[in-house]
Amino acid sequence: MMTMKVEELVTGKKTDDKESGSFLPEDFKTGEYEAAVKLEKQDDLRTASDHLSTQVDMAHGKEKKREAELKKKKLQERSKLESLEDLEKIIQLKKKKKCRKVKAPLLKEPEPEVITGPVDIAMFFRAALENKLPVIEKYLSDKGDPNVCNEYKRTALHRACSEGHLEVVKKLVEAGALLELKDMLESTALHWACRGGNLEIVKFLLDKGINRNARDKLRSTPLHVAVRTGQHDCAEHLIACEADLNAKDREGDTPMHDAVRLNRYKMVRLLILYGADLTIKNVDGKTPMDLVLQWQNGTKELFNNLKNNSYKSAHLNKF
């Protein structure tokens, strides 16, 4: 039977019989292949697969022996409770292991954007929208007007409030941005802050004295806007700052009318909790309670129509 040499087994290269007797790579004289080489020298009648399986068995046996010794050592250490001091040491080690925290990798902070050239109005507006404070600071340091507006009469303050960029808002107000300026929709910065839903900006503007009951083109107050957009925290803070709970918009709707119509349960509960009037009628003569009944009747009618249509379809399919 033809046998394979260890060199052939490991490298996959065939060697001539003449050279194989005198050639033995240094890598095979020591290390993990040493045992296989010795076995081959002792019994050249064994096949390469026999040598390989023997080698694996030996390695596996050594590994199992090491594991058993390690386990035995751990058990001996655990069972060494000769005094209260030993017990105290074990308890302290367990506490340390439990309290060990994995340190989060330190993220390299991005280098601040360096603005060298002049900042035009378009860049200024874009910076307010994208929260680029260095661009805002450069524009203001170059004596730029913080109250400049676009074709919709919207200022950088309006944009920053709608996007929730608190630091930009603070910088603009510090530079003289007017809080009560209105855009083409006659919305103030507070209207836009309520649309954006950033409570910290709402708090900041109110602390600076902005009108909490300002009206836009539809006669809506910031509270109307907060209720319609579902900004519960902003609405609650406005109410706590004595915003008008029962203010009517152009359609005669109060914030409660809007909350009921839009089926905003949390808003309805909030407004009731703070004492909103449920008897006020809008221009259609409807109170918030009327809207609830109207919604229920509309839903009932919708389901009845759906049921009737299903019955008719099933009846026609029989023919």
Swiss-Prot record:
One of its GO terms (cellular component) is nucleus. It comes from the Eukaryota. Its main location: nucleus. InterPro entries: Ankyrin_rpt, Ankyrin_rpt-contain_sf. Residues 1-26, 44-71 are annotated as: Disordered. One of its GO terms (molecular function) is RNA polymerase II-specific DNA-binding transcription factor binding. It holds the Pfam family Ank_5. The keyword Nucleus applies. It is found in: Nucleus. ANK repeats lie at residues 152-181, 185-214, 218-247, 251-280, 284-315. Keywords: ANK repeat, Nucleus, Repeat. Coiled coil: none annotated. PROSITE patterns: ANK_REP_REGION, ANK_REPEAT. Residues 59-71 have a biased composition (Basic and acidic residues). GO terms for biological process: cellular response to growth factor stimulus; myoblast differentiation; negative regulation of apoptotic process; negative regulation of gene expression; positive regulation of gene expression; positive regulation of myoblast proliferation; post-embryonic development; regulation of cell cycle. May act as a nuclear transcription factor that negatively regulates the expression of cardiac genes. PANTHER family: ANKYRIN REPEAT DOMAIN-CONTAINING PROTEIN 1 (PTHR24126:SF7), ANKYRIN REPEAT, PH AND SEC7 DOMAIN CONTAINING PROTEIN SECG-RELATED (PTHR24126). This is Ankyrin repeat domain-containing protein 1. It comes from Gallus gallus (Chicken).
